[in-house]
């Protein structure tokens, strides 16, 4: 029988509920409990798959092909547990399900209302995660801020939820902000008091308060919050701003978050084993020399658009005892100037995924610069497609080569639409999504990095390498180091006589974990270190 923890947020948005939920998951797992975490998002989109990265940040793809909120990436990285499409719920998906049931006559002609039908569907989704995962503890993060009209059905649903189970099977955690007023030199508790009052008004009494602050909270403040908010003083948890998100589990452990949560759930506070995590933080805080990595993208104004890529680079640098010196490079600025202007001093170049024409020629120019100047390079999804186009134009004597996505009239579509995508009209959830196998070719860098015959990687694309051009690429020096098991889809390519030049059709960043960096990212950083050592 699963226990349930609900994480809400107050005072301001983007307060770090996802990191708190993920950190609690890490702490529970370190005590031997199995955990699954789901996100309830209050927007009307069915999923974030068609949302602009500027609006939402990256789309995180699960093993079963769901396009989800980036917080699921945090959940997976912190707990090292794969989530599924059940772990991502939006208002849009809830309403869609309820309306479909109404159309099928599932409500027997009754009036369909927010209460009980919408809230009932939300509760059902939470129970479904528990049944599917069979986890000891289900952590649910409610998106938005207490007081937002969009979040009300979700808050009502988690209020009702305590009637579905025993009271000791549920714990409510409220993440809030304690602002520091410089002019008075005081930390203010009033916003938190009002946020808790708002929660109470809809029938939820938080069991724990996680208080974000950039100043330490003394016992007097904790006592004040305890009295006004109706929680035990031991359940007022200080959450100071951290130097890294990966240090948050350690600080919350010190504050007793996990111990107090287990106390409310009437579960044993087992011995906590965080030795590997502590070593990770030690390595993070004591790096070796810097590695200058250029991330050449089109959404660089919002770093969250490439969140998993950045974290994968960070994991690799921690493992290799290097300091990540990340350079955000606009592909459009390369088009306006030159690749050399922005990339001349970097040690490695990464070209991540994306869609559409904007900035593509800048990405292609960056790849050419990496190839010609022997700079370690890694291309992801569209990054691989751009690498194919660059080689076709500049080496394989196909100067007018392109992708049929970028130029439908190109005479040499070295990248073309997947056959199964030919008749697809809808955009949402219709790409090649989720985990697919890839067979690696012997005597290649890719095979050596993975040390496996068959790997499983997550995908999100509509276009692929055009096999009509495969032989001409092989003849001109390209190596295909990974394909689908039937050999039809090219998944991984590389170049010989280069320190490190690999590009993949899949998204390896989604499988990178702190303490277990992805082989392609680890290989990139190691190659950069080796090249620096040789040059010195």
Swiss-Prot record:
Q: Where does ATP bind?
A: 14-19, 71
Q: So what does this thing catalyse?
A: UTP + L-glutamine + ATP + H2O = CTP + L-glutamate + ADP + phosphate + 2 H(+); L-glutamine + H2O = L-glutamate + NH4(+); UTP + NH4(+) + ATP = CTP + ADP + phosphate + 2 H(+)
Judged by the first EC level, this protein's enzyme class is ligase
Record-listed L-glutamine binding positions: 354, 382-385, 405, 462
Q: Name one GO biological process term.
A: pyrimidine nucleobase biosynthetic process
- Annotated residues that bind Mg(2+) are located at 71, 141
Amino acids binding CTP: 13, 148-150, 188-193, 224
- The residues that the entry says bind UTP are 13, 188-193, 224
Entry's EC annotation: 6.3.4.2
Q: Which cysteines are joined by disulfide bonds?
A: none
Activity regulation text: Allosterically activated by GTP, when glutamine is the substrate; GTP has no effect on the reaction when ammonia is the substrate. The allosteric effector GTP functions by stabilizing the protein conformation that binds the tetrahedral intermediate(s) formed during glutamine hydrolysis. Inhibited by the product CTP, via allosteric rather than competitive inhibition.
Occurrences of domain Glutamine amidotransferase type-1 (ranges)? 292-534
Q: Which domain of life is it from?
A: Bacteria
One Pfam family hit: GATase
Q: Which CDD domains match?
A: CTPS_N (cd03113), GATase1_CTP_Synthase (cd01746)
Q: Which GO terms describe its cellular component?
A: cytosol
- Active site positions, chain numbering: 381 (nucleophile), 507, 509
Asked if the Swiss-Prot or TrEMBL record annotates the protein with the keyword Phosphoprotein, the reply is no
Q: Which function does this protein serve?
A: Catalyzes the ATP-dependent amination of UTP to CTP with either L-glutamine or ammonia as the source of nitrogen. Regulates intracellular CTP levels through interactions with the four ribonucleotide triphosphates.
Indicate the family of this protein: Belongs to the CTP synthase family.
NCBIfam families this protein is in?
PRK05380.1, PyrG
Assembly = Homotetramer.
Q: Which HAMAP family match?
A: PyrG (MF_01227)
Mind telling me what this protein is named? Answer: CTP synthase
